[in-house]
């Protein structure tokens, strides 16, 4: 069996295994609840707009901000799901001896790790795209608002999920399954908070505080990709009504799209951390 076929086979098995775990039921339940609550909330926005309590511009602005808020909820659900799937998938099999029995066959450790990574990426990205598209349809049906760049925004959310699960996979080669998930989600939350702090610093003209967000987005690109996704979901008029660049102080608006250089850095980050995961797994005593 060629290496490429081995990787694809392991990816398919990983995807099948992930679909049978209880965490999938939790993800589906949380997603359904969030979509239902958001549908009710957006219907209220539509009702207020119909009663002339809100102008059409205010309704679009409100829908834009609420959509970013709900999408952050989806990204958090995806972060929790993928982080706690990545740990048991690798370190759990290592502790139980399953990995040793698989690697006893002519299968390289790098192929095993890459296959599991590919399967988890397909799972996490698929969840984000399906849930995000469903949410966009809910918003369109209730308040007649469609994001300006939904495909690019959903792709960036899938990229955010890929970054986080790559980190979780690296951690799972060194620590226990639970610890790897906790650390990955903790870093995800810390980076988001640092991004909010940096945005506030930028709106106040404080370069030192603004640098906190800039550095955090370079160390872990999840918040940078999230802000790029927000820019694709939000209505362009939202920036004008919130004062242009000063909108960075608001956690659910993004002042500018991502640069090609940052996207290249995010790809390079995944490659580097993935390489570290392969190196760590190859040296791990099974």
Short names for language-model regions:
Residues 75-94, 267-283:
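Transmembrane alpha-helical segments in integral membrane proteins
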């Amino acid at each position: 069996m060629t290496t490429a076929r081995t990787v694809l086979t392991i990816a398919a098995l990983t995807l099948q295994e992930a679909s049978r775990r209880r965490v999938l039921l939790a993800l589906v339940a949380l997603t359904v609840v969030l979509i239902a609550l958001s549908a009710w909330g957006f219907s209220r926005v539509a009702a207020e707009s119909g009663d002339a309590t809100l102008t059409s511009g205010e309704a679009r602005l409100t829908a834009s901000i609420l959509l970013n808020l709900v999408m952050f909820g989806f990204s958090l659900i995806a972060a929790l799901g993928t982080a706690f799937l990545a740990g048991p998938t690798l370190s759990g099999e290592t502790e139980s001896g399953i990995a040793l029995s698989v690697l006893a066959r002519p299968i390289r450790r790098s192929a095993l790790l890459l296959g599991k990574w590919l399967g988890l990426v397909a799972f996490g990205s698929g969840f984000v795209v399906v849930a995000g598209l469903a949410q966009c349809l809910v918003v369109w049906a209730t308040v007649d608002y469609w994001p300006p760049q939904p495909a690019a925004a959903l792709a960036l959310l899938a990229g955010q999920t890929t970054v986080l699960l790559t980190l979780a996979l690296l951690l799972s080669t060194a620590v226990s399954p639970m610890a790897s998930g906790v650390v990955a989600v903790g870093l995800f939350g810390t980076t988001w908070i640092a991004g909010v702090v940096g945005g506030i610093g930028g709106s106040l003209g404080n370069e030192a505080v603004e640098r906190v967000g800039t550095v955090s987005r370079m160390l872990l690109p999840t918040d940078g990709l999230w802000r790029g996704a927000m820019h694709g979901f939000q209505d362009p008029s939202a920036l004008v009504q919130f004062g242009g660049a000063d909108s960075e102080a608001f956690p659910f608006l993004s002042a500018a799209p991502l640069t090609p250089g940052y996207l290249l850095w995010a790809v390079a980050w995944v490659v580097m951390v993935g390489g570290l995961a392969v190196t760590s797994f190859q040296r791990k005593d099974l």
